[in-house]
Amino acid sequence: MKLSRLALLSVFALASAPSWAESVVTVYSIDGLHDGDNSWYQVQFDAFTKATGITVRYVEGGGGVVVERLAKERTNPQADVLVTAPPFIQRAAAEKLLANFNTDAASAIPDANNLYSPLVKNYLSFIYNSKLLKTAPASWQDLLDAKFKNKLQYSTPGQAADGMAVMLQAFHSFGSKDAGFAYLGKLQANNVGPSASTGKLTALVNKGEIYVANGDLQMNLAQMERNPNVKIFWPANDKGERSALAIPYVIGLVQGAPQSENGKKLINFLLSKEAQTRVSELSWGMPVRSDVTPSDEHYKAATAALEGVQSWQPNWDDVAVSLSADISRWHKVTESE
């Protein structure tokens, strides 16, 4: 998931848009669920249009970028549905960009509330070149080894959601912000440099240009089919514990949405059992509904990858409040201002 790109994708031809004015729903979404020719989004949008006659207009951008666009359009909203990741969904809620809406699936989705709901589970992950490294780096301390100098890269906090996740994971693994920042300052000696895109790092690892990079589980599992030298790992802390920050895709209804009822219909459709059952099959994500357990091979691979890894999440409201200050401090400790 990245924060730098904003692109308008028309899911269906809109030549007759004026006559369809009330049969359209506009989605502003973070990337990741519309990748490939037969993505989860594409399949669900097609099925939604077939069932309702409502065309989906799709705008893709970074988690922060789509929220910023909503804020700029506050007096004249253009979107009906927002999909982003924490802490950007919390920022949207705090800025009153989201409308009250309890989804039909709320009782089956942990952490759903009246402003937003998790849509697809996802987790921070790390990748390494298994052709050049016999084993994955076992611990965070291993990544400080001189053999990784200019062979390690992680995406930049503030530019990439997964880069922000690395920063938060360091706070968690080392027990405090101070200790996490101290570690990231040391790690900078091996870091190739800034990267606005997390997804592009996978090809560099596969080629052996770098040995280690960050990512997210859904994206990395999908990319491994095209990048055979890449494997996933999670470094352990000094107690030998491996953990992964949960960074789900989250969905909400836009405040003042021009087609609010259509937005509600689409949200309920994407959170339905039928749609959730196919998210792993089509996009390597994991369903958020407690009453859905897919049986496809992608789901089995994702759950197997997480064996022995403890998932966790911070208080995202607190993260949203301190994020700007934390990113500024990251730039200082890494001397990357």
Swiss-Prot record:
One GO MF term attached to the UniProt entry: thiamine pyrophosphate binding
UniProt-listed SUPFAM superfamilies: Periplasmic binding protein-like II
Entry superkingdom: Bacteria
Subcellular location: Periplasm
Cross-referenced InterPro entries: AminoethylPonate_ABC-bd, SBP
Keyword annotations: Periplasm, Signal, Transport
Entry's Gene Ontology BP terms: thiamine transport
Gene Ontology CC terms, in alphabetical order: outer membrane-bounded periplasmic space
Membrane-spanning intervals of the chain: none
Endpoints of the signal sequence: 1-21
Known function: Probably part of the PhnSTUV complex (TC 3.A.1.11.5) involved in 2-aminoethylphosphonate import.
Family: Belongs to the bacterial solute-binding protein 1 family.
Classification via PANTHER family: THIAMINE-BINDING PERIPLASMIC PROTEIN (PTHR30006:SF3), THIAMINE-BINDING PERIPLASMIC PROTEIN-RELATED (PTHR30006)
Entry protein name: Putative 2-aminoethylphosphonate-binding periplasmic protein
Lineage per the UniProt record: Bacteria, Pseudomonadati, Pseudomonadota, Gammaproteobacteria, Enterobacterales
